[in-house]
Amino acid sequence: MLNKRPTIFFDLDGTLYKLRDGSYSQSPLKRYVLKNAVFYIATRLAVDKPFATKILDKILVKYREQISIGVEKELGLNRNDYFQFVWNIPARLVVRKEKNLRRNLLDLRKYYRLIIISDAPLVWVKNVLVALGVYDIFRNNIFSGEGNNRKGTKNAFPYIIKLLNLRPDRCISIGDQENTDIIPAKKLGLKTVFINQSQKSGHADFSVKSINEFTNLLLNIKL
C-alpha cells in the first residue's frame, strides 16, 4: 500500500544552510576536505604528502567531486573509512545558520514527512544538523552518500521512493543543484523547488531564495 503522506526531500549543503564564502568550490569546506584527503592517502598508503597530492589530483580529474569512489576503485581503500577520516569536520567552521530554520521545519513537520537526501557522508550530515540545531527533526529520515544509491548517479530518488513506498506526486524535492536535486526528481513526478538567492531555475516548478520563502510557498502547492 502506498504511503500517501506528503513528503519533502531536503538537500543539505546549499539548501538547509549556506556555506561561508558561498559555493562549495569557494568555501573553506572544500579546502578542509582536500587537505584531509591528502593526509588520508598519505597515511593509508604510507607515502609523503607531495606524492599523495599527485594521487589525489589524478582522482579529481577522473572522478571530480566523487573522491570517495575514486579512492575505493583506484586505491582499494574502504569508502567508509575515507568518509570518517576526511569528513569529520566541525560544521561550525563553515556553516551559516539561517534565521528561524528550526521553527520553519517544525511547522512543516506537522503536515509533511521531512527527509534529508545528500551525497555527503553521514558523519558530515550529522555534524551539520547538530550545528543547525535540527538533528532531532531528521534523525530517522537521513539518506546519505555512503552507499551506491546517490543523487550524483541518479538512482537515489527511485531507491528511496520504492523503499518508503511513496507516491511521487505527493513528494517535493528542494535543492540548489538542478542536475541532482531538480531534474531527476521531476522526471519521477515529484514537485521541484530550486533554492538560490540570485538565480531562478528553468527546470524546477518553483524557485525560492530561502527556506523561509519555501515555507510560505507550500501554501500554494497542492499535493
Predicted regions and their residues:
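N-terminal helical cap/lid subdomain that shapes the substrate entry/recognition surface
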Residues: 2-102
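Asp-based, Mg2+/Mn2+-dependent phosphohydrolase catalytic module
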Residues: 1-8, 102, 106, 112-223
